[in-house]
């Protein structure tokens, strides 16, 4: 059986960011673009919440900001089809999830296979899901951290791109651990996007190789 191989494009790319809240990772990516570190432009900032602070930030920065209320749609599939239409209209190369609190449907995942990136505040495959910083504390983990990965049909199970570890301190709370992990998120997410548009990411099966 031939193994599927994907190599990211070496080009000036077009990014769509999906967010549900403040979008601090969106800001980190955009600031890396403005500094010249990432060879891309953010062509769409999308949210499922019209009041999301990240949308306001996008508008203040002169970026194309769009929101769609999920309620009028019959189901998740129809909602994601509407999002995909917005993405197609802008000829997007990479979708970045930045605190987007809705699960991407399998149809969306398949259409943009190896072109949807996410960041997770734990060292995957340990602690998928929500409230993972508290889980790391409760389980007595000595280290936690964050992971960038491509989005697959199974939640938090896509190919891992980069990881950064932080120690879990004995007096850590969910808030203090989250804050230290967030600092690392703001480093490895822009770095992952940079590598993508330098044509340096190769995916073979479920493994990522940096070229």
Predicted feature locations:
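N-terminal Rossmann-like dinucleotide-binding module
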Residues: 2-53
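Conserved acidic residues
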Residues: 43, 93, 114
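N-terminal glycine-rich "phosphate-gripper" loop used for MgATP/nucleotide binding
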Residues: 47-48, 71-72, 76-77, 90-106
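Short, structured coil segments at secondary-structure junctions
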Residues: 61-62, 112
């Amino acid at each position: 059986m031939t193994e599927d191989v994907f190599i990211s494009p070496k080009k000036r790319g077009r990014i769509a960011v999906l967010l549900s809240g403040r979008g601090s990772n969106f800001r980190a990516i955009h600031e890396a673009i403005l500094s010249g570190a990432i060879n891309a432009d953010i062509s769409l900032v999308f949210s499922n919440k019209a009041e999301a602070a990240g949308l306001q930030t996008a508008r203040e920065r002169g970026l194309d900001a769009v929101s769609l209320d999920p309620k009028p749609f019959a189901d998740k599939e129809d909602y994601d089809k509407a999002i995909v239409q917005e993405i197609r209209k802008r000829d997007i190369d990479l979708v970045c999830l930045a605190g987007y609190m809705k699960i991407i449907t399998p149809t969306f995942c398949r259409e943009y296979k190896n072109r949807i990136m996410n960041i997770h505040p734990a060292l995957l495959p340990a602690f998928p899901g929500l409230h993972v910083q508290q889980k790391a504390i409760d389980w007595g983990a000595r280290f936690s951290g964050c992971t960038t990965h491509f989005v697959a049909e199974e939640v938090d199970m896509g190919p891992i791109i980069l990881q950064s570890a932080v120690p879990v301190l004995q007096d850590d709370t969910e808030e203090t651990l989250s804050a230290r992990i967030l600092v690392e998120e703001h480093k490895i997410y822009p770095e992952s996007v940079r590598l993508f548009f330098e044509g340096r990411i190769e995916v073979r099966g479920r493994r990522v190789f940096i070229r």
